[in-house]
Regions:
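Residue-level recognition of alpha-helix termini/interfacial anchor residues
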Residues: 25-29
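A translation/RNA-centric and nucleic-acid-associated enzymatic feature enriched
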Residues: 1-17, 30-130
Length: 130
């Protein structure tokens, strides 16, 4: 049986494999994309193979990062795209945000009874990949 940590491992290895294959085998397509981007006044893209494992930033820590970065958010709020920008400034590249409040997740997401958030709320085994 797999738990949330195992699923995150599968996802990060899959993304690492995809990016590795693109970097190794698709330079012609990357060149076509970059030719178009340059013609539109945009910078060319590069394929950067992500390192594994991806950082895990528990929801409670992510909330503190957002607050420290000047964002307005409270425990139990959703992490919105502008909050993700604050987190990404500290953790560029792929990263997981696990252990969201159980109250935010659907009924089929599991939890561990002993895991509580900073406010005492039950934490889920759910996660987001950013």
């Amino acid at each position: 049986w797999m738990d949330d940590e195992d699923v995150m491992g599968v996802q990060e290895r899959m993304l690492h494999h995809i990016w590795s294959e693109v970097a190794a085998n698709d330079q012609t397509l990357i060149d076509v994309v970059n030719e178009y981007r340059v013609s539109q006044g945009q910078d060319p893209v590069t394929v950067e193979i992500p390192n594994v494992p991806f950082p895990r930033i528990p929801y409670c820590d992510a909330i503190e990062i957002v607050k420290a970065g000047g964002g307005e958010i409270e425990w139990g709020n959703d992490i919105e795209s502008h909050h993700c920008d604050i987190i990404a400034a500290q953790y560029p590249g792929f990263h997981f945000i696990p252990r969201w409040p159980m109250s935010m997740k659907p009924f089929y997401i599991h939890h561990k009874e002993e895991e509580k958030g900073t406010s005492g709320g039950q934490l889920s085994r759910g996660f987001d990949l950013n």
